[in-house]
Amino acid sequence: MKHILIRSGKSPFYVAPPEEVIHRDLIGTNAGNLLFSDAMHKILLADRTTVTSNGISTDWSAKRAAQINEAYDAFVVPLANAFRPSYEASLNRLSKLIEQLTIPVVVVGVGAQTGVDYDTGRLKAMEPAVRRFMKAVLKRSASIGVRGELTADYLKQLGFTDVDVIGCPSMFLHGDTFPALDKKPQGLTDDSRVAINLSFAASKVGPLAAITQRAYERFPDLTYFAQNTPDAELLFWGDTSIAANASPTLPLERAHGLLRENKMRVPLDPYTWMRDLSGFDFSFGSRIHGNIAALLSGTPAMVLCHDSRTLELCRYFDIPHQKLKDLPADTEPAELYEKADFSALHNGHKERFDRFIAFMDRNGLENTFSHGDGGAVFEKEMAALELPPSIEVWDGGDDGALGYRVARLREQIAQTGQKHKDAEGRARRLEAKNKELEGRVRELEKHLNGSPLKRVTGAKKGLMVRLGPAIRRRLRRTSSKS
């Protein structure tokens, strides 16, 4: 039996209520992370394999590394856009852990993130971190699996050639087959159910707000599927934007129409996410995994690419896409639906799957499709779970989590009070230190006013006479800031 440790927010079989998902951030800030980690979990469950979730945070202590070396035969690390400046600290923590491991380490689906122009210049400063990570991984595996050609070229420029382009494991949830994506001959109508997904960084690249507003006005049955932890917190806790009479242009506050009308959801598990999306006619937006979830459920989708992480995957898998920066503000979802062509996606899927399986074979990993039941037991177990529904807009009533909300608010009040006490203590200590320094300054002035100072003339004397008052002024300013 082979025991595999996988980096993931949680096991697919672990059922967590909304408050736990938010409190522990089990989605790792983005529900898309669970989509590809759940897919990898299923793929790895061969007949002679067990798979255990390590969680999303990285404990790189020597104790944890020793535990992993003792208990597991391999560490599988599914990643997304890890080669980006904001992820550098997390990447370094992963490197520190991997450098202590004596078992194989297999990285799946890692990517570089830059603009749609593929200019990797912004990644220059983090090259040492990327090199360290790559060296640590490749000492423990035959190759590293990347999202697309951009990432492969970037790593080759850094001197790494043991790289396989495999895309994202989420697209192989169903193995070498892919769901049919049938479009209605009449296109989208006013009665069509349309799902939209948004990443707010994309609004700086193209007319995302305007396109969202047009879709909201055009389709009464429009639903916004958000993915990030702050989105879940907004739905779970609410805010004061309605009372403040705010008029947000994007659904970042409760005052937006999509939230006022309870047309926003945050999925907690990939399988409820896909189940929800299976009832829609079309999905579009700037979230790559939001649209992959739709495709996996059999719902046609179109990605509005705003950076390399989305564009790279769309190009590799032939997912229908448009560059957001090239779209006019009056773009209609019906136009995107009409342009969506899934023939290349379907025609090339088996070849891409075979390439993915070859990567796994090269790295000594069995898979459920070649060495198991094709995921049948996994799917049966998932179907038997009572997974919580996607989070909706909280109306202030008793949804079963009122006790948690009260307890959490009490904790935050207590933590805030303790922080104030700690700050006051630091201020008192600083004030005492300032008084001590002022006393030393006075002693210095007395010394300077003695007979030795009389022998000092000219510029040196003026400098020394001004020294005491200048120091006192600096101390007073420091004391006032505290």
Model features per residue range: what roles?
Residues 482:
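A C-terminal cap/extension of S-adenosyl-L-methionine-dependent methyltransferases
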Residues 1-464, 468-479:
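Active-site anion-handling motifs in enzyme catalytic cores
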